[in-house]
C-alpha cells in the first residue's frame, strides 16, 4: 500500500496535531493511501528506542509518496523541534518528494517565518514545497466539552483540496534539473 508520511513537530503527541493526523488519515483512505506519522518528541535522544525510531523514519520517508510537515509556527516556540528533527535526516533523504507544510497555532502572519526557518534543511534534504503552505490556527478548530476538537468546514475544504493536489503531484514523475 502506498502512503504519505506526516512528521509532527508538536511538543506533545496529545495535541491538536494528533486530531489533525486522524483527520488526514480518514481523508486519504478513499485514495487507498495510508498515513504514517512520526512525532518529533519521540526522537529525543534520551528516549528509549529513539535511534530505532529514527532509522524507521528514514526508511519510511524514503518510501513515502509525499511528506506532510505539521509544526507549530515560530511564536509557539516549538518550530525548532521540526528543524532539529529534519537535521537528523541524511542529506537528500526527501528525494524531491512533494511536501506540504502545515503551520499550526499562532497566526497566519507567521507562516512565512516558518517557511524561512525550514528552508535550509529542506534544501539539504532535497525537499520541495509542492503547494502553498497552510495555516491552521486556534480559530480553525471547533471545541466542545462533549467531543474531540474538529476542524471548521472552511479549513476542511482547504485541506481536502491540498490533499487532492498532493496526491496528483505524488503520481507525477519527478524531474530534477
Can you say where each PLM-predicted feature lies in the sequence?
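Mobile beta-alpha loop/short-helix "lid" or hinge segments that flank ligand
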Residues: 35-46, 125-145
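An extracytoplasmic/periplasmic, membrane-proximal ligand-sensing/linker region
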Residues: 148-150
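Short, conserved loop/helix-junction motifs that constitute active-site signature segments
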Residues: 90-95, 123
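Catalytic His-Asp charge-relay segment
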Residues: 5, 98-100
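Short, glycine-/small-residue-rich phosphate/pyrophosphate-handling segment
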Residues: 100-139, 154-157
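N-terminal beta1-alpha1-beta2 submodule of the flavodoxin-like/Rossmannoid cofactor-binding fold
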Residues: 1-91, 153-160, 164-167, 171-177
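Short, acidic Gly/Pro/Ser/Thr-rich loop/turn segments
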Residues: 12-14, 109, 141
